[in-house]
């Protein structure tokens, strides 16, 4: 049974008692930012739970309450940030106060109690792991020596499979196609194997990744109402989390054991497990559990986001045929009869790169950045007449969904217009300009930006160079929607099916 339903049934009598006897006292000094009124004890829990899409719901609320908005999930205060100015305050000016992470049940369990880089609280261990990621795992040198070869080989394999599909006049499930690509790339980069070959079961891996995503995004009653934590066990959520962790731990344990075998065949390039095992001997902070936790970040962060971004890019292009045609003409003009696009070509494809940037603006893979948690009290506000007090242990969500749709920042924000990024070539995703931070900013900016963006740019360039694209038989371009689902990543509600048609270069 749904744990939230159980909780609401049990909490209703308590909320009723609060309504009879609870009286809010006026507190001197600065107040919290405004926000929708919630029920005593429960707060805004029910409102958030019943929202079809939380990012849409919070965006609409921000239009009423402003760029700083307060909600409550039980006793836990939540701050929603919806403007570049306030995002800069949180992610840069006061980053040291706002740079920790909440200890949410799903994230804590699957990250081996916060031994990773994405979900860990701010600590000496996090600083060490972050340094490992930036100086060893995701360096420019490694990108050239290892990542490039993998990218180009796996994109080429995808194009071959799609050519067979085109010859048979069949439709393609875009997410399945792009998920296969990104999972193959990440698995080769991380542990030196293609996920659907070499004995690694495709079905097992996809099932595990799906469960991990569900548990990371899942609502655990104990996170917001500790006294009702037993509901997580009664509902089966805790048992499901434990099963997911056990399966994940076994999977990563097998991979690490293979790398530790003395008779393991030598590879011309190191994968990420090789690098971490080498660094493990020189640091007491890097344990086997730390390595597994980092693999969680690399695998779940790298596979789902790249595939999702490619789906949204193709969705936007199918819905905007003029943009599709312009992108194809530009790519085919630059590449000519070469036969494929490689990484060296990407720098010369300015319109393609603008398409990817515009996709990340209108359809950010993380509509709400991974929540932060304040480590101490903070004073923040748009101006001196609107200053607010933010309490310690406040959950902080920066809404990329709201910022990317703000008409005061973007002209015609609901339209897909890559040209806006050609007019501002300085606008990038490296966390410097706070009207556009799809990968976050500050200490917590994504460490694997280059790996993810290169995957998307190279794949999309080859998709547009090699094929023309049509909707399935019996449907029109106008039938393709852009409805979204709830979740940590911005998933498309209705699967995108498209039909490739091989382009013959004149």
Curated annotation (Swiss-Prot):
EC number: 1.14.14.-
A cellular-component GO term for this protein: membrane
Site (Substrate specificity): 118, 301, 305
Alphabetical list of PROSITE patterns matching this protein: CYTOCHROME_P450
Gene3D superfamilies, per the entry: Cytochrome P450
Keywords per UniProt: Endoplasmic reticulum, Heme, Iron, Membrane, Metal-binding, Microsome, Monooxygenase, Oxidoreductase, Transmembrane, Transmembrane helix
Membrane topology reported for the UniProt record: Single-pass membrane protein
Family annotation (InterPro entries): Cyt_P450, Cyt_P450_CS, Cyt_P450_E_grp-I, Cyt_P450_sf
Region spans: Substrate specificity: 365-370
Pathway listed: Secondary metabolite biosynthesis
Chief localisation class: membrane
GO molecular function terms noted in the UniProt entry: heme binding; iron ion binding; monooxygenase activity; oxidoreductase activity, acting on paired donors, with incorporation or reduction of molecular oxygen
Pfam families per the UniProt record, alphabetical: p450 (PF00067)
Residues where heme binds: 446
Transmembrane segments: 3-23
Cofactor entry: heme
Gene Ontology annotations of biological process type: coumarin biosynthetic process; response to wounding
Catalytic reaction equation(s): xanthotoxin + reduced [NADPH--hemoprotein reductase] + O2 = 5-hydroxyxanthotoxin + oxidized [NADPH--hemoprotein reductase] + H2O + 2 H(+)
UniProt induction comment: Accumulates in roots after wounding.
Intracellular or extracellular location(s): Microsome membrane
Similarity annotation: Belongs to the cytochrome P450 family.
Name used for this protein in its record: 5-OH-xanthotoxin synthase
Gene: CYP71AZ6
